[in-house]
Amino acid sequence: MAVKMFRDCGSEIFNTGTSKCPFVPDYIKAIILTPVGMTFKISDYDTKLGEYAHADRPNRVYPISTIAEYATSGGEAQTSATGYGSSKITGYSELVETYTMNDYDEGLRTNLMKLKNESMRVIFIDKNNVVYGEKTDTEGDFRGYELGAVYPGGQRFKSSGENASLTINLVYEDVEKAWMNAISFTSDIDILDEAKGLVWVDVKKLATGENKYKVVEHYGGFDLTEMYGTLLGASSVWNNVTAATYNPDDGTLSLTPSSGTPALKRPSELYAEDVKGIEQWS
C-alpha cells in the first residue's frame, strides 16, 4: 500500500475550458437503484441490464420507469465568515432530487416504503439512452451515485384539480463526491427497453376447474395470465409441476402438481425462459 509522504491540494487543481462539442443532458426517463457495493462494466452494461434486473438477491438492480418530471432542491454552497473576514465555502447543502412517475402505482409506492433503512446507489438513463453514474478507481468500471435515503411522495388520491401521482425522492449522501466523480456514456441500443423492474405476483388456484390457475399482481390483483400466455404454459418455468398448459379459451393455466404447491421459479431462471418482469410473492 502506497503512503503519501507530502500533502498536495488535490481537487483544487482545475481548468476552466469548455468542450468543443458541449453535451447537454436530456430528460431522465429511468432510474436504476443498485446495492451500495455493486460496480459495472461500461462496455456491456446496456446488454446486461435486463439480466441484472432479474438476478438473484443481493446482486439485483431495481429499475424504475417511466419518469415524467424532475425537480431538485439543495446542493447549494454553504458559507461562513470569521470576524470581519470574507465568507468562505464550508460545504454544500443536502441535495434532494424528486422524480415524478408518469403513472401512479400503489405497488411501487409500497415497495419504496421498504427502503427506509436501506443504503442504495442510483444510476440514471435519459431519453437518448445516455447513462449517468459515478467513476470508480478501476478503468472501465462505474457505479451509481451514493444515496442517504430513498422515499416516495406525491398525491395518493385524485383531487378536483390533480390526478393521483407518485414521486421518488433521492437524498444524496455526498453531493460534492457525486458531482466531482460523475461519468456518462451512451448506449447504442434502446437500453430503456431493459429498464423495467419486477412486479410481485401471486399464483392463484381457481375454485372452478381441476388444477386451474391464474397469475395475478400481488398489489391490485391485475390478471397477468393472458399477457404472458404460453410463456407460463411451460413446465420449465415452474417448481413442483410435471406438466403445464395455457388455455387461451378462458385465459387460465392448467398445472399438474408433482409435490407441494405449484410455484414460479426464481426471476433469474424465468428470464432465461423469456419470462420477464415478475417474481412470485414470498
List PLM regions with ranges.
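Extracellular/virion structural assembly segments
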Residues: 42-164, 173-190, 208
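Beta-strand-rich structural segments
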Residues: 206-226
